[in-house]
């Protein structure tokens, strides 16, 4: 029995850009007749880096940087060929990564 469920994972550093893209994808999937669940926020991955400010001495003086990767998931149930083709026509801004998996 073939499954018609698709999961769309979105990743971006900017959460506002990510939310707008997720909304666009969900709207285009709803217009094509698929049942949409989401966008669901997934845990944000935070990477922290600590570096010395000085090259040689002063270990007490450090600088900390962090990189946050925000993620969202959209689930499409009863996705048709029309829904999949409408997903390919959605224009996403630069900086938003997309991954589509069939469940």
From Swiss-Prot:
Belongs to the universal ribosomal protein uS10 family. SUPFAM superfamilies: Ribosomal protein S10 (SSF54999). PROSITE patterns: RIBOSOMAL_S10. PANTHER family: 30S RIBOSOMAL PROTEIN S10 FAMILY MEMBER. This is Small ribosomal subunit protein uS10. Pfam families: Ribosomal_S10. GO terms for molecular function: structural constituent of ribosome; tRNA binding. Keywords: Ribonucleoprotein, Ribosomal protein. One of its GO terms (cellular component) is small ribosomal subunit. GO terms for biological process: translation. Involved in the binding of tRNA to the ribosomes. InterPro entries: Ribosomal_uS10, Ribosomal_uS10_CS, Ribosomal_uS10_dom, Ribosomal_uS10_dom_sf. SMART domains: Ribosomal_S10. NCBIfam families: PRK00596.1 (NF001861), rpsJ_bact (TIGR01049).
């Amino acid at each position: 029995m073939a499954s018609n469920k698709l999961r769309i994972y979105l990743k971006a550093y900017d959460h506002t850009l990510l939310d707008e893209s997720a909304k666009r994808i969900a709207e285009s999937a709803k217009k094509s007749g698929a049942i949409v669940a989401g966008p669901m926020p997934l845990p944000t991955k935070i990477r922290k880096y600590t570096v010395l400010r000085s090259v040689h001495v002063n270990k007490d003086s450090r600088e900390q940087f962090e990189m946050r990767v925000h993620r969202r998931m959209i689930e499409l149930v009863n996705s048709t060929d029309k829904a999949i083709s409408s997903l390919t026509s959605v224009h996403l801004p630069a900086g938003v990564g997309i991954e589509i998996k069939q469940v």
